[in-house]
Amino acid sequence: MKTPLFCQEEKSISTAFPFLLLNSDAISAGKGEVGVASSPDIFSQRVNASKYIFLPTSSAVAINYMPFTHRAVRDVFLGGITFYKKRVRDAFGANFSYFSIGDVNLTQEIGQQTYILGTFKPTEFSLEGSYSLQLSQSFAMGVSTRFLSSQLSVPSQGKSVARALAFDIAGYFYSQEHFISSLLYRYTFGFQLSNVGTKVKYDDLGRSFYLPTQLKLGAGFLLQTDSYNEWELSIEAQKYLVPTPNEQGVPDKDIIEALVSSFSDAPNGFREEFHEINWAVGLEYKYNQSFFLRSGFFYQHKNKGDRKFLSIGAGFTFFNNWQMDVAYPFSFSTYKNPFHTFKLNLIYRFGQ
């Protein structure tokens, strides 16, 4: 009988287009990056498009921004623009996200001299759309498609642009109103299978990378104490659905096989599979739907990325149709993550 070798070193999972896992939405980021089952907002496009069905306004547009914080680099950022349109029983959403990695100097050494040949600006972007349909009074589902493009290598070095297609499927349950004495409450559930798609090669000779496919499950509880004050608590679990690296590297599997086997392929068995689950909890206070305070906590195991942070956030509406949100995380990781920085949103709601 073979005995599992639990002493093997656990390895973190690397994927193509890692910027898809960077959260530049200040609403979600302020709540520990929960989103799959939290209350709907315009940035539901990325975390659970089916939530658009339950928004009170028919359409809105928003921009979001997150900079890279390092004294030596000032032009690295992730930003995006999002739009949605809701009808009676369905909704459409669209998003464009752009990740700039700044200017890279191309140099050549001749003798003891280093010459600058020019500059190169690595970038990645995603263009996506979604469709959501209300299936019952309290439940909706949505699908999203996503075109991805990455230019990380120097154009003269063979293949310079990597492209991929991906899709999401999501569902959201938003309960009817219930009462405990004079207190009104709702409960929510959500799921999302995200970034299912083609494998990616960044150059002609390199290996293929999986997209950052994830399964997210979440639940939420909304409590309204009176007509002005509302509280929301959300919890979420996230699991990579790509092969876990072993001693030989990353197994080469087709997409369906990778999805199915990702629940049981970790070299250290169930313990390592459990370590691959990220956990998040978020709390939000709303006053008259015009002022918001948020906080949350995100946990990722130290062997699988070591992202641990406490986040805070706030938002407010102005001129009736506008809303601004900001969030900031306080990291507890053993290393400094340059993307643990502030996030900023600006939202405009039509016809409010």
Q: What residues fall within each predicted segment?
A:
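Sec/Tat signal peptide C-region and signal peptidase I cleavage site
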Residues: 3-7
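Subset of outer-membrane beta-barrel
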Residues: 8-352
